[in-house]
Amino acid sequence: QTNWNTDFIVDQPYTSFKFFFTANSADPGAQYPVSGFMKFSDGSNLQVINETMNPPIGTGRMFGPFPAIPGKQASQMNFKVGASNDPGALGFSYRISVQGCR
């Protein structure tokens, strides 16, 4: 089972959110689409990350902090890491996490 599309549960109110990505392996020329969404209890969402990365192995990247949206209750943070179009990039591994900040 891959984790290219991962939801992180938000179980309390936070003032902002940070997304973290670290490549454990990568093909030197491969490009990976990365996107992140704030999902809300009313079913709506807001895209906060939309870019293509060529991550060096062992290098981390923080996205954010993204402020909480007034009047909206965050229910999940969603992180998507897509596949590269480069066939040599198969087997790419990475770590992702999301942090809620008070």
Language-model region placement:
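Short, surface-exposed binding/anchoring microloops in extracellular/periplasmic proteins
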Residues: Q1-V34
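Short, solvent-exposed coil/turn segments at beta-strand boundaries
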Residues: S16, S41-S44, K72-A74
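Mature soluble domains of exported/periplasmic/lumenal proteins and thiol-rich metal-chelating peptides
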Residues: D11-T15, Y32, I49, M53-N54, ...
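Glycine-centered loop/turn motifs
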Residues: Q31, G58-G60, A74-Q76
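Short, surface-exposed beta-strand/strand-loop-strand elements in extracellular ectodomains
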Residues: G29-T52
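Noncatalytic modules at the cell exterior or secretory-pathway interfaces
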Residues: F19, P65-F92
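Exposed low-complexity, polar/acidic, P/S/T/G-rich flexible segments that act as propeptides
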Residues: G36-M38, S44, G82-R102
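Beta-sandwich interaction modules
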Residues: N3-Q12, P56-G71
